[in-house]
Amino acid sequence: MKHIRNFSIIAHIDHGKSTLSDRLIQVCGGLSDREMAAQVLDSMDLERERGITIKSQSVTLNYTAKDGETYQLNFIDTPGHVDFAYEVSRSLAACEGALLVVDAGQGVEAQTLANCYTAIEMDLEVVPILNKIDLPAADPERVAEEIEEIVGIDAMDATRCSAKTGLGVEDVLENIVSAIPAPEGDPDAPLQALIIDSWFDNYLGVVSLVRIKNGSLKKNDKIKVMSTGQAWGVDRLGIFTPKQVDTDVLNTGEVGWVVCGIKDILGAPVGDTLTLAKNGSDKPLPGFKKVKPQVYAGLFPVSSDDYENFRDALGKLSLNDASLFYEPENSAALGFGFRCGFLGMLHMEIIQERLEREYDLDLITTAPTVVYEVEKTDGELLYVDSPAKLPAINDIEEIREPIARCNILVPSDYLGNVITLCVEKRGLQVDMVYHGNQVAVTYDIPMAEVVLDFFDRLKSTSRGYASLDYNFQRFEASNMVRVDVLLNGDKVDALALITHKDQSQTRGRQLVEKMKEFIPRQMFDIAIQAAIGNHIIARSTVKQLRKNVIAKCYGGDVSRKKKLLKKQKEGKKRMKQIGNVELPQEAFLAILHVGKD
């Protein structure tokens, strides 16, 4: 056991985590050169296309150190994006140490900081690594100082390496062996295994990634899932060397995968504890803190026949992604679907794209909203995650919106732009600290403003140098209203949005103008209106297409033309009463463009 090292790699987006993992695998001979590909661990197509890590991946490598001993390294490559911070905290729970990878050109960024603090809170040994020292812009001395000043860990003798060229990777491995402590645990105690992650395999059923804290797990053992109390037989178990390799036993301190033939998706939830069915442990391990979704959106299948498949797909996906929340929802405009909760906009895009690709579904998404706390006049408290659930105006005492605490790290040259942006987003400054050339600014900004496009705007005003980390702080009373959209006088529930009263006029106007672009012209006028309660605040009209009925009249009497026009007018009127307006998917996404221009 003293030869096992469990660690995660944490870093900001694009600081070279996945490339470093590739090098570690190569040096330790986890894969032959023929099988080696760039970013081996980013196994999803989506990850490769976007160049980001979405799911944490684990690998077990054997490394022969300079002291002649062979060590078993279990490491977990984690995502760097703020939306997937939950994946990171889960991975860290399975480790004793973390490599903090910092780009020697760019220095410390907000996400580095957030993940590093998570690691320190969990009492992990944090080992700083300066990556990309082969770049001409690299300045390891400055960055080492920055790490000491901003993060507060000793970094003067931080290992320097270039994951791309392979320079210094041996030193990184030696450092892991010497600096990261061996796992603690009692091999003779009853089995306790923490489920770090699970996914659904069509042939094997549920596959779980586990970290053995105490005891050991063997093939054909009878095990029990603590939360459900169900017992299963272990069919197969093993490790990843990135490839799935079968073994006969997983010992204390090891990380590996287990298949127990569980077919029910909720059979082995992430964060749960496995123990032996006979003489097992009676105490579960402390799991993970549950994350609350920050953004909610309705997802509806385009054809209602897909509803069952959609439900199964969501079930399988939520097994793999513990932070996804969903419940059935019914909309007058879109039929049956689900209200889903996500950690952020990127998370939402990724989930939608995975559902469409992996499960072959066609989906319509409604505009995302955050959760509001609503106090009714009779004192009842509601949590509203969809504009349709907001009570009538005269039943509401006050609406409180969620406020996010945003930590932004930005070079001092771009500070002005960032402050302007935060103020425009109704932010309040909490703190500002200068660290050399970097400034750490803290703002309290309404979650609704942060979630939509704050990240993109922040990147563009600071030319990509600013970085952001945010978390939910509190609910605060605010003057929020619901803007409804009416098409020919009928409310479309899926198009409503909740916004601040000061911005409701502009948002309403932008929304109807945007909708006008997306709704195709029909044989009758379509009036698009935005309303707060019964008060119409904006309107635009999609003009009808009309046939030129008087084309066949040559000269002749004007009353003849009038008669034809009148007849056409009556026909249009009749049509308007019975006609339906077809809404394309783009019209539902028009809300997303509101407030961007």
From Swiss-Prot:
SMART domains: EFG_C (SM00838). GO terms for cellular component: plasma membrane. Required for accurate and efficient protein synthesis under certain stress conditions. May act as a fidelity factor of the translation reaction, by catalyzing a one-codon backward translocation of tRNAs on improperly translocated ribosomes. Back-translocation proceeds from a post-translocation (POST) complex to a pre-translocation (PRE) complex, thus giving elongation factor G a second chance to translocate the tRNAs correctly. Binds to ribosomes in a GTP-dependent manner. Pfam families: EFG_C (PF00679), GTP_EFTU (PF00009), GTP_EFTU_D2 (PF03144), LepA_C (PF06421). The keyword Endoplasmic reticulum does not apply. The keyword Hydrolase applies. GO terms for biological process: positive regulation of translation. GTP binds at D14, H15, G16, K17, S18, T19, N131, K132, I133, D134. CDD domains: EF4_II, EF4_III, LepA, lepA_C. Residues 2-184 form the tr-type G domain. Belongs to the TRAFAC class translation factor GTPase superfamily. Classic translation factor GTPase family. LepA subfamily. It is found in: Cell inner membrane. HAMAP family: LepA. Its EC number is 3.6.5.n1. GO terms for molecular function: GTP binding; GTPase activity; guanosine tetraphosphate binding; ribosome binding; translation elongation factor activity. This is Elongation factor 4. It is a peripheral membrane protein. InterPro entries: EF-4 (IPR006297), EFG_III/V (IPR035647), EFG_V-like (IPR000640), EFTu-like_2 (IPR004161), G_TR_CS (IPR031157), LepA_C_sf (IPR038363), LepA_CTD (IPR013842), LepA_IV (IPR035654). It catalyses: GTP + H2O = GDP + phosphate + H(+). Disulfide bonds: none annotated. Keywords: Cell inner membrane, Cell membrane, GTP-binding, Hydrolase, Membrane, Nucleotide-binding, Protein biosynthesis.
